[in-house]
A protein has these predicted regions:
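Repeated loop/turn-to-beta-strand initiation elements of outer-membrane beta-barrel proteins
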Residues: 33-35, 67-73, 100-106, 135-141, ...
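Outer-membrane beta-barrel "beta-signal"
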Residues: 202-211, 230-244
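Transmembrane beta-strands of outer-membrane beta-barrel pores
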Residues: 39-45, 75-79, 110-114, 133-135, ...
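Short glycine/proline- and aromatic-enriched beta-strand/turn motifs that initiate or cap beta-hairpins
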Residues: 28-79
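Residue-level signature of outer-membrane beta-barrel architecture
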Residues: 41, 63-65, 94-96, 102, ...
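Hydrophobic, lipid-facing positions within transmembrane beta-strands of outer-membrane proteins
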Residues: 33-35, 55-61, 88-90, 104, ...
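Solvent-exposed loop/turn segments connecting transmembrane beta-strands
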Residues: 46-55, 77-87, 114-123, 145-156, ...
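Detector for outer-membrane/organellar transmembrane beta-barrel domains
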Residues: 120-188
Length: 244
Protein backbone atom coordinates (compact mmCIF):
# COMPACT_ATOMS: atom_id res chain seq x y z
CA UNK A 1 0.00 0.00 0.00
CA UNK A 2 2.86 2.37 0.83
CA UNK A 3 4.40 1.65 -2.58
CA UNK A 4 1.10 2.48 -4.32
CA UNK A 5 0.74 5.77 -2.44
CA UNK A 6 4.35 6.68 -3.20
CA UNK A 7 3.94 5.97 -6.91
CA UNK A 8 0.70 7.97 -7.05
CA UNK A 9 2.37 10.97 -5.38
CA UNK A 10 5.40 10.68 -7.64
CA UNK A 11 3.26 10.52 -10.77
CA UNK A 12 1.21 13.53 -9.65
CA UNK A 13 4.30 15.60 -8.88
CA UNK A 14 6.00 14.79 -12.17
CA UNK A 15 2.84 15.47 -14.17
CA UNK A 16 2.35 18.81 -12.40
CA UNK A 17 5.98 19.76 -13.04
CA UNK A 18 5.74 18.90 -16.74
CA UNK A 19 2.47 20.82 -17.08
CA UNK A 20 4.01 23.85 -15.39
CA UNK A 21 6.95 23.82 -17.80
CA UNK A 22 4.65 23.42 -20.78
CA UNK A 23 2.57 26.46 -19.97
CA UNK A 24 5.11 28.69 -18.23
CA UNK A 25 5.23 32.26 -19.71
CA UNK A 26 9.02 32.03 -19.56
CA UNK A 27 8.92 29.60 -22.48
CA UNK A 28 5.97 31.08 -24.35
CA UNK A 29 8.12 32.91 -26.88
CA UNK A 30 10.62 30.12 -27.55
CA UNK A 31 8.73 26.85 -27.24
CA UNK A 32 6.10 24.89 -29.11
CA UNK A 33 3.22 23.12 -27.40
CA UNK A 34 1.35 20.40 -29.28
CA UNK A 35 -1.25 17.85 -28.32
CA UNK A 36 -3.41 15.03 -29.56
CA UNK A 37 -6.57 13.15 -28.58
CA UNK A 38 -7.60 9.81 -29.96
CA UNK A 39 -9.42 6.50 -29.59
CA UNK A 40 -7.73 3.10 -29.86
CA UNK A 41 -9.17 -0.40 -29.87
CA UNK A 42 -6.58 -1.58 -27.31
CA UNK A 43 -3.43 -0.45 -25.51
CA UNK A 44 -0.42 -2.47 -26.69
CA UNK A 45 3.08 -2.22 -25.23
CA UNK A 46 5.91 -4.13 -26.95
CA UNK A 47 3.54 -6.70 -28.39
CA UNK A 48 1.57 -7.27 -25.17
CA UNK A 49 -1.89 -5.94 -24.28
CA UNK A 50 -1.99 -3.65 -21.24
CA UNK A 51 -5.76 -3.18 -21.56
CA UNK A 52 -8.67 -5.41 -22.57
CA UNK A 53 -9.79 -5.20 -26.22
CA UNK A 54 -12.14 -2.27 -25.59
CA UNK A 55 -12.19 1.35 -26.85
CA UNK A 56 -9.56 3.50 -25.14
CA UNK A 57 -9.56 7.32 -25.04
CA UNK A 58 -6.07 8.84 -25.06
CA UNK A 59 -4.73 12.36 -24.67
CA UNK A 60 -1.20 13.77 -24.89
CA UNK A 61 0.60 17.10 -24.55
CA UNK A 62 4.22 17.88 -25.41
CA UNK A 63 6.50 20.90 -25.20
CA UNK A 64 9.58 21.25 -27.40
CA UNK A 65 12.35 23.83 -27.10
CA UNK A 66 14.60 25.14 -29.90
CA UNK A 67 17.59 23.63 -28.06
CA UNK A 68 16.27 20.09 -28.56
CA UNK A 69 14.59 19.42 -25.22
CA UNK A 70 11.15 17.83 -25.18
CA UNK A 71 8.76 17.21 -22.30
CA UNK A 72 5.60 15.19 -22.66
CA UNK A 73 2.74 13.67 -20.71
CA UNK A 74 -0.11 11.41 -21.77
CA UNK A 75 -2.99 9.51 -20.20
CA UNK A 76 -5.51 6.90 -21.32
CA UNK A 77 -8.79 5.55 -19.98
CA UNK A 78 -11.33 2.97 -21.05
CA UNK A 79 -14.55 4.49 -22.41
CA UNK A 80 -16.58 2.08 -20.27
CA UNK A 81 -14.68 3.19 -17.10
CA UNK A 82 -13.95 6.91 -17.60
CA UNK A 83 -13.10 7.51 -13.95
CA UNK A 84 -10.06 5.19 -14.01
CA UNK A 85 -6.72 6.08 -15.59
CA UNK A 86 -5.58 2.99 -17.49
CA UNK A 87 -2.16 4.39 -18.39
CA UNK A 88 -0.13 7.50 -17.54
CA UNK A 89 3.20 8.39 -19.11
CA UNK A 90 5.72 11.17 -18.51
CA UNK A 91 8.73 11.60 -20.81
CA UNK A 92 11.77 13.89 -20.93
CA UNK A 93 13.89 13.78 -24.10
CA UNK A 94 16.89 15.53 -25.64
CA UNK A 95 17.69 15.54 -29.37
CA UNK A 96 21.12 15.95 -30.96
CA UNK A 97 21.86 16.44 -34.64
CA UNK A 98 24.60 14.08 -35.80
CA UNK A 99 24.49 15.07 -39.49
CA UNK A 100 22.04 16.36 -42.07
CA UNK A 101 20.32 12.97 -42.07
CA UNK A 102 20.93 11.48 -38.63
CA UNK A 103 19.65 12.45 -35.19
CA UNK A 104 20.17 10.98 -31.75
CA UNK A 105 17.63 11.08 -28.94
CA UNK A 106 18.05 10.30 -25.26
CA UNK A 107 14.91 9.82 -23.15
CA UNK A 108 13.80 9.09 -19.61
CA UNK A 109 10.25 7.76 -19.24
CA UNK A 110 7.95 6.88 -16.37
CA UNK A 111 4.96 4.57 -16.93
CA UNK A 112 2.17 4.07 -14.40
CA UNK A 113 -1.07 2.08 -14.60
CA UNK A 114 -2.91 3.26 -11.46
CA UNK A 115 -6.41 2.04 -12.38
CA UNK A 116 -5.38 -1.01 -14.37
CA UNK A 117 -4.89 -4.16 -12.28
CA UNK A 118 -4.20 -6.17 -15.41
CA UNK A 119 -1.07 -4.09 -16.15
CA UNK A 120 0.40 -3.67 -12.67
CA UNK A 121 3.58 -5.48 -13.72
CA UNK A 122 4.17 -2.85 -16.42
CA UNK A 123 4.71 0.04 -13.95
CA UNK A 124 8.26 1.09 -14.67
CA UNK A 125 10.88 3.70 -15.44
CA UNK A 126 12.97 3.54 -18.61
CA UNK A 127 16.07 5.15 -20.07
CA UNK A 128 16.49 4.88 -23.83
CA UNK A 129 18.76 5.98 -26.65
CA UNK A 130 17.49 6.17 -30.25
CA UNK A 131 19.23 6.80 -33.55
CA UNK A 132 16.92 8.31 -36.20
CA UNK A 133 17.54 8.42 -39.95
CA UNK A 134 15.47 11.08 -41.73
CA UNK A 135 12.30 10.18 -39.82
CA UNK A 136 12.29 6.93 -41.82
CA UNK A 137 14.31 4.48 -39.72
CA UNK A 138 14.70 4.41 -35.93
CA UNK A 139 16.88 2.06 -33.89
CA UNK A 140 16.54 2.16 -30.11
CA UNK A 141 18.00 0.57 -26.99
CA UNK A 142 16.18 0.72 -23.64
CA UNK A 143 16.98 -0.06 -20.02
CA UNK A 144 13.93 -0.89 -17.89
CA UNK A 145 13.44 -0.88 -14.11
CA UNK A 146 10.16 -2.03 -12.55
CA UNK A 147 8.63 0.24 -9.91
CA UNK A 148 5.98 -2.15 -8.57
CA UNK A 149 6.37 -5.28 -6.47
CA UNK A 150 9.56 -6.75 -5.02
CA UNK A 151 11.39 -7.74 -8.21
CA UNK A 152 13.52 -4.90 -9.58
CA UNK A 153 16.09 -6.71 -11.71
CA UNK A 154 16.98 -4.45 -14.70
CA UNK A 155 15.65 -5.42 -18.11
CA UNK A 156 16.63 -4.50 -21.64
CA UNK A 157 14.91 -4.03 -24.99
CA UNK A 158 15.92 -3.23 -28.57
CA UNK A 159 13.58 -1.92 -31.27
CA UNK A 160 13.79 -1.09 -34.98
CA UNK A 161 10.98 0.91 -36.59
CA UNK A 162 10.44 1.90 -40.22
CA UNK A 163 8.09 4.47 -41.76
CA UNK A 164 7.64 5.17 -45.47
CA UNK A 165 5.25 7.72 -47.07
CA UNK A 166 3.04 6.69 -49.99
CA UNK A 167 0.63 8.52 -52.30
CA UNK A 168 -2.80 9.92 -51.36
CA UNK A 169 -1.83 10.68 -47.74
CA UNK A 170 -1.03 7.03 -46.97
CA UNK A 171 2.11 5.59 -45.42
CA UNK A 172 3.29 2.22 -44.17
CA UNK A 173 4.99 1.42 -40.89
CA UNK A 174 6.75 -1.64 -39.56
CA UNK A 175 8.65 -2.53 -36.43
CA UNK A 176 10.37 -5.45 -34.75
CA UNK A 177 11.81 -5.76 -31.29
CA UNK A 178 13.22 -8.05 -28.65
CA UNK A 179 12.83 -7.55 -24.90
CA UNK A 180 13.30 -9.26 -21.58
CA UNK A 181 9.92 -10.03 -20.04
CA UNK A 182 8.78 -7.96 -17.09
CA UNK A 183 8.00 -11.08 -15.07
CA UNK A 184 10.78 -13.42 -13.95
CA UNK A 185 10.23 -17.01 -12.79
CA UNK A 186 10.34 -17.39 -9.00
CA UNK A 187 12.04 -20.41 -7.44
CA UNK A 188 13.58 -21.59 -4.15
CA UNK A 189 16.52 -19.23 -4.60
CA UNK A 190 14.39 -16.19 -5.46
CA UNK A 191 13.72 -14.63 -8.83
CA UNK A 192 15.46 -16.13 -11.85
CA UNK A 193 16.53 -14.52 -15.09
CA UNK A 194 13.87 -12.80 -17.18
CA UNK A 195 13.08 -14.64 -20.39
CA UNK A 196 13.41 -12.98 -23.79
CA UNK A 197 10.58 -12.63 -26.29
CA UNK A 198 10.17 -11.06 -29.74
CA UNK A 199 7.39 -8.90 -31.12
CA UNK A 200 6.53 -6.81 -34.14
CA UNK A 201 3.89 -4.91 -36.05
CA UNK A 202 3.02 -3.96 -39.62
CA UNK A 203 0.61 -1.12 -40.29
CA UNK A 204 -0.92 1.30 -42.74
CA UNK A 205 -1.51 4.97 -41.88
CA UNK A 206 -3.74 7.60 -43.46
CA UNK A 207 -3.17 11.21 -42.38
CA UNK A 208 -4.73 14.45 -43.59
CA UNK A 209 -4.13 17.72 -41.76
CA UNK A 210 -4.66 17.10 -38.04
CA UNK A 211 -6.38 13.74 -38.61
CA UNK A 212 -4.67 10.37 -38.53
CA UNK A 213 -5.98 6.81 -38.83
CA UNK A 214 -3.82 3.73 -38.30
CA UNK A 215 -4.41 -0.01 -38.52
CA UNK A 216 -1.69 -2.37 -37.26
CA UNK A 217 -1.18 -6.12 -37.42
CA UNK A 218 0.47 -7.02 -34.10
CA UNK A 219 2.35 -10.23 -33.32
CA UNK A 220 4.52 -11.76 -30.61
CA UNK A 221 6.39 -15.05 -30.50
CA UNK A 222 4.70 -18.19 -29.09
CA UNK A 223 6.76 -18.00 -25.90
CA UNK A 224 5.01 -14.81 -24.87
CA UNK A 225 1.62 -16.50 -25.46
CA UNK A 226 2.46 -19.24 -22.97
CA UNK A 227 3.92 -16.87 -20.39
CA UNK A 228 1.47 -13.97 -20.50
CA UNK A 229 -1.84 -15.68 -21.26
CA UNK A 230 -4.56 -13.02 -21.43
CA UNK A 231 -1.97 -10.25 -21.92
CA UNK A 232 -1.42 -11.32 -25.52
CA UNK A 233 -2.58 -8.50 -27.79
CA UNK A 234 -5.37 -8.77 -30.34
CA UNK A 235 -4.01 -9.42 -33.84
CA UNK A 236 -5.42 -6.12 -35.15
CA UNK A 237 -5.25 -2.74 -33.39
CA UNK A 238 -6.81 0.43 -34.79
CA UNK A 239 -6.41 4.09 -33.78
CA UNK A 240 -7.96 7.38 -34.91
CA UNK A 241 -6.55 10.66 -33.57
CA UNK A 242 -6.71 14.43 -33.96
CA UNK A 243 -3.70 16.65 -33.24
CA UNK A 244 -3.54 20.33 -32.36
Amino acid sequence: MTSCRYRARLASLVLAFVTMLMWSPLHAQTSGVTGAVGISSELVDRGLAVSPPTPIVQGALSWTSPSGWSLGASAATEIRSPGKVSEALVQVSKYWSLSNEWQMRGSVLYYDYPGNARAKYFDRSEASVDWIYRDILTFGLSGICLTNGDEHQPRGAADVNFHWPLAWHFSVSAGVGVAQSLLSPYGPNGYGHASVYRYGQLGVIWSYGPWRMELDRVAADPGSHRQWGNLVASPWVGTISWSF
